[in-house]
Amino acid sequence: SSSFSRRAATTEGYGMFALVEYLYNTSNINYVDKNLIGSFGHSAGGLAAIRGAQYFGKQSKKLSEENKLHSVFVSGMVRMGFKEKDIKHVDSNVGLSYALYDEGSWQNELKNGDMSIAPEALNLVRHQVSDPSISKIGIDSFYGKLNDRNLTVVHNEKVLHPMQPYLFEPMKNQIDFFLKTFNIDRSIVATNQVWHWKEFFTLVALVCSFLLIVPFAKFLFSKYPSGPFQIIVFNLDILLINKLIVLGPISNPIS
């Protein structure tokens, strides 16, 4: 979503808070299980996800009702949203994935990407299982119970931050988390991923679009019209060429 707010992740979840409210309260979308609404985000989107868990956690305690956000998965973000004062409001299942070689890990409390001893990750796990004595996290191990809405897992893949949405292991961890928390039949295993073919053919389309710029421009100018339509066609030609050069194909990773 777009917002003029500089705190859009915290105050709006980039639009996710309103979307969850709509899904939960409307009768228009009857194919969504209102008791199994989840949220996933990477990087700044990860901040929005954990802020959502906190926002709806506060709301559920205030109204004495079940949290509307059943489960959240946070990818590539711990430097914000994981302080004790924030985490104490969470009462959703939480999955955390942080790249061991994240180039932004210098911003974390210990200046590295090791989640087994990261204070931010420890704050999460300690709160979820109500055990302040935990001093080291078992990576890829589940803590808490699904029925208590405090199931928690921390992943620490040996990759870079921007590669998390583009590699099989991080994607598998995300899928497995929601399969587990939503009790979904695992007839299709999380390793059976096909999204990478979309990215591959998007790359092919990008290369082809650049290769076509010169021959396409030559074709447009080869049979140039005369008369009053000449200026109009010329402007359209320039517009099309600029669009090819500036934009090319646009792709959004599946996450």
Regions from the language model: what does each represent?
Residues 192-255:
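Core alpha-helical transmembrane segments of integral membrane proteins
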Residues 1-194:
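Soluble extramembrane regions of membrane proteins in the secretory/endomembrane system
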